[in-house]
Amino acid sequence: MSMLKDPSSKYRAFPTIDIPDRTWPSKTITEAPIWCSSDLRDGNQSLIEPMDAVKKLRFWKTLVAVGVKEIEASFPAASQTDFDFVRTLIEDNHIPEDTTIQVLTQGREDLIARTFESLRGAKKAIVHLYNATSPSFRRIVFNQDKEGIKAIAVNAAKLFVKYAAQQPETQWTFEYSPETFSATELEFAKEVCDAVIEVWNPTPEHKMILNLPATVECATPNIYADQIEWFGRHINRRDSVIISLHTHNDRGTGVAATELGLMAGADRVEGCLFGNGERTGNVDLVTVALNMYTQGLDPQLDFSDIDGVRKVVEECNQIQVHPRHPYVGDLVHTAFSGSHQDAIRKGFTQQKDDALWEVPYLPIDPADIGRSYEAVIRVNSQSGKGGIAYLLEQEYDISLPRRMQIEFSQVVQAETDRVGLEMTAPQIYALLQREYLQANTPYALVSHRLQEENGNSFVEVEVSGKGQGETNLHWKGKGNGALEALVAGLPIGVEIMDYNEHAIGAGTNAKAAAYIELRVNGERPVHGVGIDENITTASFKALFSALNRSLSQQEAKAA
């Protein structure tokens, strides 16, 4: 079987929502929502190997540390393991004063009774009721009409009131989800929710939660936003209801649907860290939160150690985070492209600590989430001079002049093409050493002597010359400065085109780096590098580096 030529014979477009005066498109997110993690329930039930109690407790503590204030811990009536985990959290005092445990149940009385029993002794708790309301579930799964589906919700809501009254020491919050809300007729979803509201009788001081799931994402995110805005306009007692979002990622737009839903008036978001969950996953709370952060809004969640959070999530879920996952993937702050690297390097150079963040290609400062800058630029055959220069600057305090960056990038690219692999900073530095710092044939500097007299420099150098056997060469020169004097003493026509120098490090261990661009015998300019504790020695080494490289290239050209 293959894809249909006419998919409309099998699939139908989702109907649009008629709201000609919709307001959400012109709104922005101005404050963080109430966050609820469903990692330990929705996320856990989707794992090949669900978490054991040890992993669950580790995950719980991570969520608390991040700052999630409402955590759906389990489906206590589903298994003894889930029930016992809730008891452990309560009896061993793992629930901070500012954090509320949430549990899920269906509408049967035995399940509801077991759920409330699991929460005995909790200071406060959210009990979450759900039943599916969409046409396909009514027809295919439950064989119920609308009145039957509404009756399930209303009867269960009454049981919530009954069992909560038996444990008055707990501060209860009730939550209702018309599961498959986004595929349910809006008028019917409102009808069911209004009926539950009448039973629970919330007030502005003691609100209930209406959670509106895109249980299966079946339309573009703007339609979900329309559904949320319509619902918020029409639901009874809006001032006594917290509207919560619970999106999935079947179409790949869970984050967008959540953000537009918040613009449409929602107050709360349920999801999982890094988007774990059934099928393609729940909305990723981390991405939504850090999207807010990069817009200058405090998300009220702390991902200062995002890699530490990722480690816990990966080990507990036994699922690796994709290297391209927003904000946390191994490669999301990494540039291989030459033009990208050049822009990033220039951005870092100009970025000031107290200024607005404006580094190209990096929507967030990696340091804000505990990332180093080491992996920002990596070098392969697609890389250019900017990335190579950046790595040398960051790792070795080597600042190549611009024209030398171009020359050396060709050397690096030839090497990456040859080996077909990425090059690390140590490998690039080793290539710099081999190509420039160790370019000591045919002439290698052995020693030099410099004298200053009447504004002139007098230089005498000793070099080991190719084919000279045990006898070294001695050249003398005079000029306006050490380099000019050395050039004057060379038996070869040399023209200095450019010279740069800078310190490497500071204090007693500082060294000097010198860079020379010169033309030898009228040939094309080449570069040389010298590093030494003494700046004059470094400049002489740079000159011989360039001289030797030029002569070697001329020899190879003539061969």
Swiss-Prot record:
E.C. numbers: 2.3.3.13
CDD domains xref list: DRE_TIM_LeuA (cd07942)
Reported cofactor(s): Mg(2+)
GO CC, any one term: cytoplasm
Reaction it catalyzes: 3-methyl-2-oxobutanoate + acetyl-CoA + H2O = (2S)-2-isopropylmalate + CoA + H(+)
Regulatory domain, as annotated region: 439-559
Pyruvate carboxyltransferase domain: residues covered: 33-307
Broad EC category: transferase
Protein family per UniProt: Belongs to the alpha-IPM synthase/homocitrate synthase family. LeuA type 2 subfamily.
Quaternary structure and interacting proteins, as annotated: Homodimer.
PANTHER family assigned: 2-ISOPROPYLMALATE SYNTHASE, PTHR46911
Role description: Catalyzes the condensation of the acetyl group of acetyl-CoA with 3-methyl-2-oxobutanoate (2-ketoisovalerate) to form 3-carboxy-3-hydroxy-4-methylpentanoate (2-isopropylmalate).
Protein name as catalogued: 2-isopropylmalate synthase
Organism, scientific name: Pseudomonas fluorescens (strain SBW25)
Record lineage: Bacteria, Pseudomonadati, Pseudomonadota, Gammaproteobacteria, Pseudomonadales
